Amino acid sequence: TTDEQQDRGSVVGFYHIGIPPLDMPSDWTTIVRQQMQRILKSEAYRAASSLHVSVSGPSFNVASYLVTALSQDDPKIALHWSPDAPSYEREIPTLQRMYDHCAAHPKDTLFYLHTKGATRKRPPTSWTMAHWRSYMEYYILDHGRLCQHAIQHGGCDICGLDWRDEDFFASYFAGNFFWTSCAHIRRLPPPNVLVPLAKAAERRLGDWSEFWLAMAPDFKASVLHSTSGLFYLEPYMPEDYEDPSGFRNQSMPHCFPAQRSCATTPHSSSCKGFGP
């Protein structure tokens, strides 16, 4: 009903476009074109009241043109630019925008994706990354109702693919495409506090953007699909994950509880990770 929809808030999308330095080989424009075309046809976008497209790096005019032209200037889309964001911040500016949105809209449900692989131009990595992106988009975008149901009706706080539970390091959704609620986001630290850590760890500990979603002390997670595949090395083909029925014969996702005792220091060896 309308009252129930108002009580749940809106569905809002966040899309991070990370543009590498101009002297770095990249096919980011191809990635943006492919992802925007898929977004616009997806269940996730049809459910959304708005989509925030946040661009980090140079060439904002090119990114803006691609998004505007492909969407035919859809008023649902808002464009943002972080021109001076250093490369080590990666997705943090867009996640901060998501965090700020939730401060004003605590009932909203969110989905998030980014230009995974934009800095990996050379084969075979660029080829395997394209397959990885497509796999994540299949669940998070094309069949977005699965995660939307898990968040809005299933009692889950986060929903995604390939949950990685590292005792020493951190827990995260591999690839960092996900759905979540503003109620969960409001329990996390502001992403901007990760900037000094990201700068210090740029070449050692990987991408802090992936770890942020799991920095609440406890939550319930829904994992739609998992594989032990090495996405950087091996292509994950559609026949390995697509459901011929479009998930019409599958029950809705369920959650498992998760807890962490050192949410603000996920690099600490005292972290025990998450588990059912």
Residue ranges with predicted function:
Residues 1-276:
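ER/Golgi luminal nucleotide-sugar-dependent glycosyltransferases, focusing on the catalytic module
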